[in-house]
């Protein structure tokens, strides 16, 4: 469980945050972010994005996941990357190497397995981190999976060997993203709740016509647990007027300059735009305790439930918040 903390912004940082929050979105760089970003063992790695001028229009591809009554599809595990002490990136192959997943941005898939002694199968949703949409990854999908001590699916996935198969079903649609629909979006994530946020961020900055500004607040236990950090740092350097990331850790290292412990009201009040000053949308994804503190729980996948917690206390409306 996260410890509480007090986030004290130095005056220069506070001024920087206010300036960033009030600036109009700058014109997008002519170097959009295209292509899948992948993680490697420990240190991680990623593909650099290429210019759209170097890309020809994508041709029509067959899709693997069509939804409806399609049923479960078994995919073979093709590659495993050990990202850190409790996270792996798993690549699953499609039968047709030229096919695409068919998922929309930030949508998820159901996974299923049944052990030899299990009475019923274990089913869990996961959001892939492979590229989706127009420039979708061909022939595979990638999952970023954190092992939880009492998580039957995460433990099964971590114990899988290359060549074994896993059942998938989907897609499960989430938020229908529209370019520049919002002036500013705020992503509040904990742990592997970063995966749908990453899909949104990559979609926004791969489209030169999308002018959306993005603020990320990301909570983890240790610095090693910050997934996709290199990719987010690259975005901050490339789009300093449109993307900012703030991190908070339960067990920070010495000389850690950012937040310590759980995401608090003080932190969000400091780094998020005021609810009535901009056309904003806030997205939340993380463990149940985080939902309870920040926004309140969803009632069901189709029912967002009422807004409560810190975001309500700060004056945001139910319509301004989406819970993954």
From Swiss-Prot:
Coiled coil: none annotated. Its EC number is 1.6.2.2. It comes from the Eukaryota. It catalyses: 2 Fe(III)-[cytochrome b5] + NADH = 2 Fe(II)-[cytochrome b5] + NAD(+) + H(+). May mediate the reduction of outer membrane cytochrome b5. Belongs to the flavoprotein pyridine nucleotide cytochrome reductase family. This is NADH-cytochrome b5 reductase 2. It comes from Ajellomyces capsulatus (strain NAm1 / WU24) (Darling's disease fungus).
């Amino acid at each position: 469980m996260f410890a509480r903390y007090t986030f004290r912004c130095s005056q220069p940082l506070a001024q920087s945050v206010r300036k960033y929050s009030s600036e109009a979105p700058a014109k997008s760089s002519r170097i959009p972010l295209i292509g899948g970003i992948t993680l490697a063992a420990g240190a991680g790695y990623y593909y650099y994005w290429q210019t759209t001028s170097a890309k020809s229009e994508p041709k029509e591809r067959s899709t693997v996941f069509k939804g409806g009554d399609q049923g479960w599809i078994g995919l073979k595990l093709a590659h495993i990357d050990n990202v850190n002490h409790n996270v792996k990136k798993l690549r699953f192959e499609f039968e047709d190497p030229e096919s695409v997943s068919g998922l929309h941005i930030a949508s998820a898939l159901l996974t299923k397995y049944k052990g030899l002694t299990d009475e019923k199968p274990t089913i869990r949703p996961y959001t892939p981190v492979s590229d989706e949409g127009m420039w979708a990854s061909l022939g595979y999908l990638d999952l970023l999976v954190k092992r939880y001590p009492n998580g039957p699916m995460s433990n099964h996935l971590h114990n899988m060997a290359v060549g074994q198969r896993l059942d998938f079903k989907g897609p499960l649609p989430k938020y229908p993203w529209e370019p520049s629909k919002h002036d500013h979006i705020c992503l509040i994530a904990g742990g592997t709740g970063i995966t749908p946020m990453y899909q949104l961020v990559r979609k926004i900055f791969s489209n030169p016509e999308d002018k959306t500004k993005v603020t990320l607040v990301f909570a983890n236990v240790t610095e090693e647990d910050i997934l996709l950090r290199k990719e987010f740092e690259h975005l901050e350097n490339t789009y300093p007027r449109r993307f900012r990331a703030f991190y908070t850790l339960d067990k920070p290292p010495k000389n850690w300059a950012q937040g310590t412990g759980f995401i608090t009201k003080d932190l969000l009040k400091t780094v998020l735009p005021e609810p009535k000053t901009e056309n904003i949308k806030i997205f939340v994804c993380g463990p149940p305790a985080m939902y309870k503190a920040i926004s309140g729980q969803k009632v069901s996948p189709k029912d967002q439930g009422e807004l409560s917690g810190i975001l309500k206390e700060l004056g945001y409306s139910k319509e301004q918040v989406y819970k993954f």
